[in-house]
Amino acid sequence: MAQRGIREFHAKKILARYLKEYSNGKFHYDGKVALVTPEYSLDQAAKDNKWIKETPLTVKPDQLFGKRGKHGLVLLNASFEQAKQWISERMGKEVQVGKTKGILSHFLVEPFVPHDREYYIAIKTEAEGDRIYFSDEGGVDIEENWEKVKQFFVPILGSVDDIDLSALDSLIRDFVKALYKIFVDLDFTYLEINPFTIVENEVIPLDLVARLDDTAYFWNKDKWGDIEFPTPFGRIFTKEEEFIKELDEKTGASLKLTILNPKGRVWLLVAGGGASVIYADTVVDLGFGNELANYGEYSGNPSEEETYLYAKTVIDLMTREKDPRGKILIIGGGIANFTDVAKTFKGIIRALKEYKEKLRENNVKIYVRRGGPNYKEGLKLMKELGEELGVPIEVYGPELPMTRVVTLALKGGTNESN
């Protein structure tokens, strides 16, 4: 599972689409929101949304960063002309939010809503279930008043209908249940509305943050609608990261790549999101964090061709610049449940063969550790490859802990028993 943030605009559109249905008609949200971008101006938005010129407006950037009000990046109770000027003055400009600098490019526009009560609700996925947070004193100071937040826990395979919500009044209780069911059915991993208000059973989310499980895209894309997973604020993808991102979006498998240090000596080709964390953390724990070149994973039984393209991208990056100390490639993973190890290894082997000379020139040492369906065949292919390439390849099965193979790779080791 990869948790990925979505724009407030898209999250509010999802809420507007499903709140009435999931609350059995008790609540609704009209979803009056517009997204202004460099390609879609406020004038164009006003043509498609008549309310923009008929009501006071709220405007704020919609680029996956918070505390916009505290950074002076929220315009309230504005006329159309004021909103237009405010956006014009900020579009394409660099701002600093905390320690991060980035360019403003997307602005959320919605009706300004005068209100008396502000509520807070958040739902997040944890290892053993989902946790719900609620307070009837929401707003920008929620963190300073955290002792007033009520918490409820829904275990895995549990139902929110079985949870004791008697601490909430009946109206709020029904809303919490409806929102939680949307959260589960549409594969949210995090959803925070702070604040929201309720006016005559219309729920008005004034500020919303959401993340989705992107591996659910193929069965939820129709429910999600025309959403996107934006680049985190201030983050610019390299050409290679963009390529893997596009490849990931076209497949039912999961392919992720983040370049940490293109001149690093330690490179990872890891199967599985959980395993990728273990391998990367172990590299750092052993004192090689500054040498870690990349972070990422392939999982969900990718095809041989997809694995080849992924591996080729990593190997190409690794062999662009030589290091007199040589380089280390760890091809790892846990014990797969359904990914065909031999099939994915064939894709990696194809890429390694293609870069045979560059691997030698860069003095690359390769360490392999894998288990799962057809892993013995996959490991056999890897052993044979080492002889063919003239590149040292140490091959290990699931009998060797993941952390141990990293230690061997970074501090030297052989697999003479195999």
Predicted regions: what is each one?
Residues 2-192, 197-327, 353-357, 371, ...:
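ATP-dependent carboxylate/acyl-activation modules
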Residues 344-350:
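Charged helix-capping and loop-helix junction motifs
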